[in-house]
Amino acid sequence: MENFFIVKKLASDTYGKALNVDLDRLLQAQNKYTLQELISYCSALTILHYDYSTLAARLSVYLLHQSTASSFSEAVSLQAAQSCSRLSPQFVDVVYKYKAIFDSYIDYSRDYKLTLLGIETMKNSYLLKNKDGVIMERPQDAYMRVAIMIYGMGRVVNMKMILLTYDLLSRHVITHASPTMFNAGTKKPQLSSCFLLNVNDNLENLYDMVKTAGIISGGGGGIGLCLSGIRAKNSFISGSGLRSNGIQNYIVLQNASQCYANQGGLRPGAYAVYLELWHQDIFTFLQMPRLKGQMAEQRLNAPNLKYGLWVPDLFMEILEDQIHDRGDGTWYLFSPDQAPNLHKVFDLERSRHKNAHREFRKLYYQYVAEKRYTGVTTAKEIIKEWFKTVIQVGNPYIGFKDAINRKSNLSHVGTITNSNLCIEITIPCWEGSEAEQGVCNLAAVNLAAFIRENSYDYRGLIEAAGNVTENLDNIIDNGYYPTEATRRSNMRHRPIGIGVFGLADVFASFKMKFGSPEAIAMDEAIHAALYYGAMRRSVELAKEKGSHPSFPGSAASKGLLQPDLWVRCDDLVFSWEERVAQTTQGVLTPKKWWQLRLAAMQGVRNGYLTALMPTATSSNSTGKNECFEPFTSNLYTRRTLSGEFIVLNKYLIDDLKEINLWTEAIQQQLLNAGGSIQHILDIPAEIRERYKTSREMNQKILTKHAAARNPFVSQSMSLNYYFYEPELSQVLTVLVLGWKKGLTTGSYYCHFSPGAGTQKKIIRNSEKACSADCEACLL
């Protein structure tokens, strides 16, 4: 009976709201199961009510608390005493010096607010362990550890900001990236999430980049590599008189390195390789991710890597003309040793006018006229080959090279040649005597934290964005850098990436449906507020600490904010300020934007501010939906490194309970339909419309939402698409629409599988882009 009394107390309002669970059922179960086994038992009952999952989470927290220290300083002391302690002596000294403050302020009851997915993920990935794998801290300890790392490891211990940051983390208002969470306070605090490398076409650098990528991966970073400068297969090497192997063998080498250099032993390494479409080896590149086919059968593929295409406007124009029979689609292929610098130039304007500023187009056709091309194909042939691979593995990603460069605040620094693991980071990088390897530190804001009874708290969101900006700026100074080139880049540009999660929760709370005018307007306003709050704080930090060294010549130095770059490109109407003012009910007015422009001209601390990354772990921990995406399903099992857990859409359940429709019959129909409610006709049409899953809605809706938020994104976004069937025409429709709307990301993952309504089982959410093997830049 002792176990039952524990369960009964955990189900009461002692640890939050009282739970709607059947205590009689649990009384019978406790005779059969241990407390640990009851966690799985309760999780399996989630289909009855999401409170069973909450009870399972509370049980998991309770057991963790039973086996860990009851104060923060004691937890640190026990870890420091270990023979192989990861904690840095400086961190331990700070904790000992201020232990009375930390111990009295930390609130372990907040651990009980974690979801089951959240506490299990924390235990598996983030909480520090001893050499035997025994967990040595609680989630609240981890949050305090991160806060101290950010504000307590410099020349001055900023206690006010330590406690504020702890509060924001522990109340799940903000989250910091995975490397920050598991490396904060350690002897080698690599806190950065994303690294961008540019591979040069010489043997020394080719191998240097294998080593560099491996070292970065070992510290928890995700990597994006540009391969566009590597000469094509069979190209002549004048120094040796031999022929080049091209990119294929090099990709296989990086694939092997990734498998070996896992992220601190916590999860697999994660690399993405990028190539431009004019490269002679493009068809080889497109076949290498495949799990089936000739290359896979010969084991010449590299399926563990992620792949990305860097797509210029010229290709999209030729493709569109070919699709509509306005041209033959001719596309020329080159080897960069014979046609140099194509990846180092971009088109500043999209106009087809002969006097338009289009450096890439000019150089491309110059090389065509000089007959430097090594092959000829068509745009359709390339996109068809891309599509064959996407059907199998969901990528290569598509990044619109020219849009990314022309809308970059750092376009004066150099051409952006590639992105990162999840195609949301866009930092210039190059090799040479003054090499720069792009680095970005990530965090995300929980949009659901600002839901009020009858309104949305845009002021609170602005303030939180400012707090995260200051956090990330401090991380730049306090983190460990694996190479001098990463340090040089980060200190020069000081880029940060603030993302979001819980947008679908916001819409569900206000009973909005994706694609409605009010939802699109709110999407725009939320990201405008996020950007505004980050820029405002970055300007304030510049007054205190100075601007980033590459500020002179940046768009901001000329009084141009991120949305102004979109207006300049004719991708955003000039009246956007009035629209945002109306949606935010006067919180963000045209006058405030004008004042921000004037202030930014005087100095900005950070070269980039916002980037919309996947947020799997943050969403898992807090029970909110991932990043800016719609709900993938209303019922599914989520597979993570920690195991599989049932996730139920609580907003749908609450709406059905309001009208007395959450019955056993509806539960069974939902289960049979794999999480879809579109064919459950007992549910009102208005509710069915609001709870369409990401695949059930027209994919153009996702593009339109992306176009609404993208003008306020300093870098880019991890934009997924979901389709029932693999039809190229459907995919091209959204890609071309996104390109025409000026999006920076064409696509992250494209998912093709039967929809929820055709599956007679709970969806396994393995199709999510934020899977366990792709979490390096995730939060």
UniProtKB/Swiss-Prot annotation:
Covalent S-S links between cysteines: 194-440
Site (Important for electron transfer): 748-749
Activity control summary: Under complex allosteric control mediated by deoxynucleoside triphosphates and ATP binding. The type of nucleotide bound at the specificity site determines substrate preference. It seems probable that ATP makes the enzyme reduce CDP and UDP, dGTP favors ADP reduction and dTTP favors GDP reduction.
Keywords tagged on the record: Allosteric enzyme, ATP-binding, Deoxyribonucleotide synthesis, Disulfide bond, Early protein, Nucleotide-binding, Oxidoreductase
Induction entry: Expressed in the early phase of the viral replicative cycle.
GO annotation terms (biological process): deoxyribonucleotide biosynthetic process
Important for hydrogen atom transfer (site feature) positions: 194, 440
UniProt site (Interacts with thioredoxin/glutaredoxin): 774, 777
Key word Cytoplasm present: no
Family: Belongs to the ribonucleoside diphosphate reductase large chain family.
Function statement: Ribonucleoside-diphosphate reductase holoenzyme provides the precursors necessary for viral DNA synthesis. Allows virus growth in non-dividing cells. Catalyzes the biosynthesis of deoxyribonucleotides from the corresponding ribonucleotides.
SUBUNIT field: Heterotetramer composed of a homodimer of the large subunit (R1) and a homodimer of the small subunit (R2). Larger multisubunit protein complex are also active, composed of (R1)n(R2)n.
Name the record gives this protein: Ribonucleoside-diphosphate reductase large subunit
